[in-house]
Amino acid sequence: MKPYHELTSRGQLRRLRRLVLEVLTSYDLVVKQVSFLTIETNTMFRVDTEDGDKYVLRIYSDEETTLRENQAEMFWLDAIIRDTDIKVCEPVRRNDGSYITVASVDGVPGERRCVLFRWVPGRALADNLSPRAYYQLGQTLAKLHDHAQQLNLLPESIHPKQWDKVFYYPDEPIVYNTAHYHHYFPPESIALLDDVIYRANVLFKQLYADRASKMLIHGDLHFWNVHLYRGELYVIDFEDVMLGYPLQDVAVTLSYGRDRPDYDELRAAFCEGYSSLRVWPGESDSEIETLIAARTVMFINYVARIDPTPQQYIEQRCERLQNYLRDFG
């Protein structure tokens, strides 16, 4: 059998489809069709059943999450579905009652963590942006935060990640200041990123000093991770669930769409929606903008590492960081 790493992308997907079929034997489903859906760090397959139901099977990337973090995701989703009317991506229990399958098949290296989700209707909110939708998004995030705050102490087995520094993924290579990447990062760019990292890490230290207020947050709530269907919002992709603070979730949401001409209007609608149900987090825009800058640095480093032609992205994002320091430095 040809080694997995020597296969074409199509060949690797054929192998992974065999893994999916093996995982699906743990569910009480009569499978009609399994087809590749997308790869966005994780690999997704669509599953159609004979009775007409649709599902998505997610194969987690080892680079992005751990089993314990996946367990935290399932814990919160299960609680949200049990306790609230918030519409979220719904994981499906296996025949043994658990959510997560750790599977392996010949020809695919290692073990793969997999979860089956019910199909989420509608289209990405990114395709339907409006002040009304962003008002709803603000309310939805406020409801998520209310629920997280009301949860009892987390079980000892639940260990979400924490966004307590700029580079918070434990195994993430930091490359922007290394010799191998000097052609992308001249000294002034390195100094710029260093300055932002220092300022952001000061804020992270201040936030996480308040241990009593830490709670589960979504960690990646933006207009690509929300579907709009018949006027209602469905929140998906809780993979980045973390122990943190509402301010961090707000910053993630507001970090998207900043080049749009209607960004200020969308931002105001989001703030109004959130504030209609819950006190707005943070004391100033400076805190939100610092968290947005921290996320920008993380993405600059990530894109430099994985994109064969990252120069334009790096330059554009560095310009944003310069504007941040000018306005809030």
Model segments located where?
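Juxta-kinase regulatory segment immediately upstream of eukaryotic protein kinase catalytic domains
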Residues: M1-V31
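ATP/Mg2+ or Mg2+-diphosphate-binding catalytic cores
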Residues: K2-L7, M298-G329
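Protein kinase glycine-rich loop
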Residues: S35-T38
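Active-site acidic catalytic loop and adjacent metal/ATP-binding pocket
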Residues: E40-T49, V56-L57, P91, H147, ...
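A conserved alpha-helical element in kinase catalytic cores
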Residues: I59-E111, N128-Q136
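A glycine-centered beta->alpha junction motif in the catalytic cores
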Residues: D62, G97, G110, C114-D127, ...
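A cross-family kinase active-site recognition segment
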Residues: D127-E188
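Active-site activation/catalytic loop segments of kinase-like enzymes and analogous catalytic loops
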Residues: P246-V279, A293-T309
